Design a protein with these regions (language model features):
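Amphipathic helical "hinge" segments at domain boundaries
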Residues: 2-4, 10, 48-124, 201, ...
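Periplasmic-binding protein-like
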Residues: 76, 130-140, 194-200, 229-232, ...
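N-terminal helix-turn-helix DNA-binding module of bacterial transcription factors
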Residues: 1-64
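Flexible loop/hinge segments that line or gate small-molecule binding clefts
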Residues: 139-179, 278-291
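Hydrophobic alpha-helical segments within soluble ligand-binding/sensing domains
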Residues: 170-197, 238-243, 295-316
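Short beta-strand elements in bilobed, periplasmic/extracellular small-molecule ligand-binding domains
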Residues: 102-115, 196-198, 209-239, 280
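An alpha-beta-alpha
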Residues: 183-222, 318-339
Length: 351
């Protein structure tokens, strides 16, 4: 076979006596066909010169692997947050989109938990292999220095979040750095000048202080008198010194995460946006009364599935030599916790 003139799908279809559409679906690893049909098409494709095609290799591997599995291809979603922790709204959005995207690509999701007290990680990986699962999504470790002591050499694995330090896998992350810069740009366009950032130190450590780094960059474009240092909320006593920080630096808008910060400001007598603006840097639909930056957890989940499937299609497993780090940009969300631009206010007042 001339490598510059590979066989067409129609040629394979003619050889096996099946439709062109059926052959095309099998070669793209789309479920819905009997194992015998898939093997017949793969064999014919190899005989016609497809043996070295990377996708073909992945499909053939998949055919062999599914003999020990249920028919539908499966991706394991391993929850990596602390056992017993209530799942936050953003994690539910992530989970929902992981499932939806898997279905779109012809897969389904089975869920596991890394910190299941009745199952060690080594046992978990044995179960995954026994079920014929080859694709794995590690869903957001909360710790900032996690290391995996398990063999993943035969699995296509993607990690969500930056908590996993070893091994270095392909990972999908929130663009914390860009999200803060987006918020600053929007707020300054609304007339805010003194922007104060208050964040849990735990979150900053987990994200490698990306927002604090972005704050340093944003300050370079501000009058020195308007630069306010970050307020780190400590784990045990998050608001010790917070009121003093507010009085000393007098921010006209606060950027942070979580209900506790919003509540603390209200208890100190601040109302939004009359006394001070408030922006939630981890916005989701549960915060519809606030302005914020939506990290787009749904897109993060979809991208994680895409990356796992892409590895499966290329028959690539194990720890990558050069891991990808994909950052998902956040989106600015308008809300009543920040004031409107003067031009808009004037226009509305005339109506």
């Amino acid at each position: 076979m001339n490598p510059d003139n590979p066989p067409s799908i129609q040629m394979i279809a003619d050889k096996v006596g099946l439709s062109k559409a059926t052959v095309s679906r099998v070669l793209r690893n789309i479920p819905g066909h009997k194992a015998e049909t898939r093997e017949k098409i793969i064999k014919a494709a190899e005989e016609l010169g497809y043996t070295s095609h990377p996708i073909m290799s992945a499909v053939m591997s998949s055919v062999r692997f599914k003999k020990t599995s249920e028919y539908s291809p499966i991706i394991a979603e391993i929850h990596c947050q602390p056992w017993g922790r209530k799942r936050a709204w953003n994690m539910e959005i992530l989970r929902e989109h992981i499932h939806k995207q898997a279905v779109q690509l012809g897969y389904r999701i089975e869920e596991f938990h890394w910190f299941d007290p009745e199952m060690k990680p080594q046992r978990l990986m044995q179960i995954i292999r026994a079920r014929g699962i080859r694709g794995v999504i590690l869903e957001h470790f909360m710790a900032s220095n996690m290391e995996l002591d398990v063999d993943i050499s035969d699995l296509a694995v993607v990690s969500i979040g930056g908590g996993l330090r070893f091994p270095r896998l392909h990972r999908i992350e929130v663009n914390y750095f860009g999200g803060l810069l987006t918020a600053f740009k929007q707020l300054r366009s609304l007339g805010y000048k003194r922007l104060g950032v208050a964040l849990p130190r735990f979150f900053e450590t987990m994200s490698e202080f990306k927002r604090e780094g972005a704050l340093h960059i944003a300050h370079q474009d501000m009058d020195p008198s308007d630069r306010i240092p970050i307020f780190h909320m400590e784990d045990d006593e998050p608001f010790v010194g917070f009121e003093a920080w507010l009085k000393k630096y007098k921010p006209d808008c606060i950027l942070g995460v979580g209900r506790s910060l919003e509540t603390q400001l209200a208890e100190l007598g601040y109302s939004f946006p009359k006394d001070i603006g408030f922006v939630h840097l981890g916005w989701h639909p549960g915060y519809e009364e606030l302005a914020g930056v939506n990290p787009n957890w749904g897109t993060i989940g979809e991208t994680a599935v895409n990356q796992v499937v892409e590895q499966l299609n290329r028959n690539v497993c194990g720890v990558p030599e050069h891991p990808l780090r994909i950052l998902i940009d956040g989106s600015w969300v308008e809300g009543p916790s920040v004031r409107l631009p003067e031009s808009i206010t004037v226009t509305e007042s005339k109506k």
